[in-house]
Amino acid sequence: MNQSVQTIMIIAGGTGGHIFPGLSVARYLMNHGYKVVWIGSKDRIESELVPVYNIDIKYICIQGLRGKKIYQKLITLLFLIFFAMYQSFKIIRCWKPDIVLSMGGYVSGPSSLVAWLYGIPVIIHEQNRIMGLTNRYVSRFAKKILQGFPNTVNGAITSGNPLRYEILSIPDPVHRLEGRTGPIRVLVVGGSTGSFIFNKVIPEVFGKLFGKLIIWHQSGKKGFNDTIQAYKKLHCNSSNYKVVPFIDNMAHAYSWADVIISRSGALMVSEISYVGLPAIFVPFNYHKDYQQYWNAFQLVKSGSAIIIEQERFTSDYVSIILGNWNRKVLLNMAILSKSLEMSNATQLVAQTVMRYLNGK
């Protein structure tokens, strides 16, 4: 390894909400002459996404602890975590990184701890409005803490959430939405794996408001066939809806949409605000700390979005809301959403790491 090039190790895994911000920062650092390496989990999406960018990635075996019974947690603590630390030790000894940027996910816990034991400085970035369990532990020995939303952690640097590069070129809401006519375009995104409740309710909404909506629906792979059948049973014109397992080009989807219905993961909320889209958020209801609810709270407070708890997410209720929104209302909501965006997060996160390496 060329020792004249400083090596930055990114630790991130599990979901796109951790992976995509990490990739944005990695690309920035690589463009500025740094070597970037990555620790993740082999059975999660980072194993597919990270190599595409010519980033060396190695894997550790780890899984989440939340929601398990006490004896299962103990087994995980005694075996999986210690094994993950052993794997991390071998990886870090091989790569000898100059600094670690932990972007969250369960994978970041053991690897960050081993880096700290090696005397390697650790910087963390918390994407969510409520700090995740793993980052809470890592924050105890982190040299710096960056946060995607204000007031998440006392003393942290508010950077915003690094966004995918392709999102940054989307025109602002006025140029994009003003002058549009026709049915309201509704983008439905239930995360990378889809959402059962969206797949059940949205076809019913489409039927109730037929002729008033055009739907682009990401169903996830598992829910794809059932969702397609739900739309077909309505015997409606198929040109007014499109169901796909996964949307590869989110920039195009965001540009196309007038309004979005989605979960409120941190990255999704940040992207929606940057693009300037009215939103109906349905927070994932199994987080004990209501993490997704608080991610969306600022947009709701601004009047650019609403939150519907999953228990109230019915076709009747959603139909009433969408039926009452016209293009003037949606444009005003989009402008309010855009006013809260933080577009330079990638640069802020990367430069924080670079400055620390350079002793500034």
Swiss-Prot record:
Keywords assigned: Cell cycle, Cell division, Cell inner membrane, Cell membrane, Cell shape, Cell wall biogenesis/degradation, Glycosyltransferase, Membrane, Peptidoglycan synthesis, Transferase
Classification via PANTHER family: GLYCOSYLTRANSFERASE (PTHR21015:SF22), UDP-N-ACETYLGLUCOSAMINE--N-ACETYLMURAMYL-(PENTAPEPTIDE) PYROPHOSPHORYL-UNDECAPRENOL N-ACETYLGLUCOSAMINE TRANSFERASE 1 (PTHR21015)
Enzyme Commission code: 2.4.1.227
Chief location of this protein within or outside the cell: membrane
Stated role: Cell wall formation. Catalyzes the transfer of a GlcNAc subunit on undecaprenyl-pyrophosphoryl-MurNAc-pentapeptide (lipid intermediate I) to form undecaprenyl-pyrophosphoryl-MurNAc-(pentapeptide)GlcNAc (lipid intermediate II).
Database matches in CDD domains: GT28_MurG
GO biological process: one example: cell wall organization
Gene3D superfamilies assigned to the protein according to its UniProt record, in alphabetical order: Glycogen Phosphorylase B
Species of provenance: Blochmanniella floridana
SUPFAM superfamilies documented for this protein: UDP-Glycosyltransferase/glycogen phosphorylase (SSF53756)
GO MF entries: UDP-N-acetyl-D-glucosamine:N-acetylmuramoyl-L-alanyl-D-glutamyl-meso-2,6-diaminopimelyl-D-alanyl-D-alanine-diphosphoundecaprenol 4-beta-N-acetylglucosaminlytransferase activity; undecaprenyldiphospho-muramoylpentapeptide beta-N-acetylglucosaminyltransferase activity
InterPro entries the UniProt entry points to: GlcNAc_MurG, Glyco_trans_28_C, GlycoTrans_28_N
A Pfam family of this chain: Glyco_tran_28_C
Highest taxon of the lineage: Bacteria
Localization terms from the record: Cell inner membrane
NCBIfam families named in the record: murG
Family: Belongs to the glycosyltransferase 28 family. MurG subfamily.
Cellular component, GO annotation: plasma membrane
Name this polypeptide is given: UDP-N-acetylglucosamine--N-acetylmuramyl-(pentapeptide) pyrophosphoryl-undecaprenol N-acetylglucosamine transferase
Membrane topology: Peripheral membrane protein
Catalysis: reaction(s): di-trans,octa-cis-undecaprenyl diphospho-N-acetyl-alpha-D-muramoyl-L-alanyl-D-glutamyl-meso-2,6-diaminopimeloyl-D-alanyl-D-alanine + UDP-N-acetyl-alpha-D-glucosamine = di-trans,octa-cis-undecaprenyl diphospho-[N-acetyl-alpha-D-glucosaminyl-(1->4)]-N-acetyl-alpha-D-muramoyl-L-alanyl-D-glutamyl-meso-2,6-diaminopimeloyl-D-alanyl-D-alanine + UDP + H(+)
Xref: HAMAP family: MurG (MF_00033)
Annotated pathway: Cell wall biogenesis; peptidoglycan biosynthesis
UniProt-annotated binding residues for UDP-N-acetyl-alpha-D-glucosamine: 15-17, 128, 164, 192, 247, 292
